[in-house]
Amino acid sequence: MRNLILVGPMGAGKSTIGRLLAKELRLPFKDSDKEIELRTGANIPWIFDKEGEPGFRDREQAMIAELCAFDGVVLATGGGAVMRDANRKALHEGGRVVYLHASVEQQVGRTSRDRNRPLLRTANPEKTLRDLLAIRDPLYREIADLVVETDERPPRMVVLDILDRLAQLPPR
């Protein structure tokens, strides 16, 4: 396995589960959003405010291309990374892709106190999450080698499920 790449919506657990997977597999963990913040010295909301979503997505595309060129990392992506064809291609070719699926209700519960999510700065974050999932779910599934439910499951159980199911996949 080159890399293990986690995709899914905000609040699905990509960063939490990614760190646990990296520890279990003894691999480095990378979070594309955190890497963008480290590189720019600015947080994601600031980048959205100054450059708009297209400016952020340009940075994200460059970062995903760079991180997918690594060999032997666990990578957590931002929820919208799958919106660009180039990103989906890089992610699919960069390693095994696991789609961490979470219901909108779980996403709301997990993101409600997080002010670091520019797309949720709306009057109705639940509707925003529902609309985003309707658009992005088919794109996550398009590139996923595995789809794993995270609702009402402790992160450790999700990690064990992923490792067990990865071991059963044929080489590609």
UniProtKB/Swiss-Prot annotation:
ATP binds at residues 11-16, 117, 153. It is found in: Cytoplasm. SUPFAM superfamilies: P-loop containing nucleoside triphosphate hydrolases. This is Shikimate kinase. It holds the Pfam family SKI. Monomer. Mg(2+) binds at residue 15. Its main location: cytoplasm. The gene is aroK. Substrate binds at residues 33, 57, 79, 136. Its EC number is 2.7.1.71. Belongs to the shikimate kinase family. It catalyses: shikimate + ATP = 3-phosphoshikimate + ADP + H(+). Its cofactor is Mg(2+). Pathway: Metabolic intermediate biosynthesis; chorismate biosynthesis; chorismate from D-erythrose 4-phosphate and phosphoenolpyruvate: step 5/7. Catalyzes the specific phosphorylation of the 3-hydroxyl group of shikimic acid using ATP as a cosubstrate. InterPro entries: P-loop_NTPase, Shikimate/glucono_kinase, Shikimate_kinase/TSH1, Shikimate_kinase_CS. The keyword ATP-binding applies.
